[in-house]
Amino acid sequence: MAESTVRKGHQKPLTSEVALRGKKLEHGDGEVVIIGGMVLDIHATPSVRANSGTTVPGKVYYVRGGVARNVAECMSKLGAKPFMISAIGFDMAGNLLLNQWKSAGLSAEVGILKDKDIETPVVCNLFDINGEVAAGVASVEALEKYLTPDWILHFRNSLPSAPVLMVDANLSHPALEAACKMAADMECPVWFEPVSVTKARRISFVVEYVTFVSPNEDELIAMANALSGCDEFQPLKESQKKNISVMSLFQLLKPAIWVLLENGIEMVLVTVGSNGVFLCNKGGPRHFKKHTEKINRTGFGGQLYKAFMQKNPPSRSSGISELNKSSHLFAVHFPSLAASVVRLTGAGDCLVGGILTSICAGLDIMQSVSVGIAVAKAAVEAEANVPNTFNLSAIAEDAKSAYSGAKVLFHQSML
């Protein structure tokens, strides 16, 4: 088991400042800017085990999806008002997405390109009887064709006041680069959502601009290989993960995580299914701090902040000595929460949506990840990618469980 540097009498708070490239992540009157896909998901779920070559009874649902859209909808239902940049058509799928977007009180007048020539992105997923994706077909070419650098740059004036820009990897290489360079010019931190194993490799085009990434295990491996320039890392086999301890799983993923941190990414958030989440940075607990003097705690964001702080102490002593060295990998493990699983597809997006909303409400990164895990729990218990409503009290209570269960997993030199 890896040693952590713990000395009694020299304890430092684990949760305070998040050091971000360019500027501190603060919230005034700005909105999170989100660029990426608005997609209609078709979910086919058999009621018995599916057989090749024939149909089986089950249910087929039309679900509003797309990583960026899911994150934005989640944030809106948590009280934030993100600014969305995307593209859809005037077809059935586009109308379904647009009508829901307007009903959520979000603006569709600017940011979302609408054109009769656009075929709205559609993804069809076939699930197994356990709720896991068994196979899928994605028709999302319109995102690369119509979400162009020119369209994105129309909205550069939205970034100066934005606390963060989130991009999903559905964007083409030129569009990703344009968005991230635009953010860098405005000193706006960038959150990169990898979307899929194939598209996760697009991190190599923009890594110098990225502050946060949120891959799952397989996406992490793909990103590390893309940044290494070779297939140095192999995806974990199911046999490797069977009955494995959290520490052993982290040790398997640690070299890939370090590649991302060595390439300048400041925070790596790895989702590991039922094993929870790893939050990793390069340095130590000092880099988990965040100034909150200018946070605007009004509206629902203020309620979220108050609800969390009532359930949890304002700071937690971790017993970690202050080894702020660039050669040190610092990792915290958050456990998953027990849930009555209906569907797993929206969990990761709601995790990110919960984290972003919480940061903007004034919670630090540890607290925000705890809220994100609570929001993800609510997502897996719903049929839709994003639940119709969130219960603030339940979110705060579940966040308390995630927060109290967080443990420092690793704090050691990588030299």
Task: Enumerate the predicted regions with their spans.
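A generic structural signal for short hydrophobic patches within well-formed alpha-helices
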Residues: 220-221, 277
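Glycine-rich phosphate/adenosyl-contacting loop at the front of the ribokinase-like
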Residues: 2-104, 123, 130, 135, ...
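Non-cysteine beta-strand/loop elements that form the S-adenosyl-L-methionine
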Residues: 210-220
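Beta-strand->loop->alpha-helix junctions that form or flank phosphate-binding loops
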Residues: 59-60, 85-90, 107-120, 193-195, ...
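Short, glycine/polar-rich helix-capping loops at beta-to-alpha or helix-loop-helix junctions
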Residues: 194-209
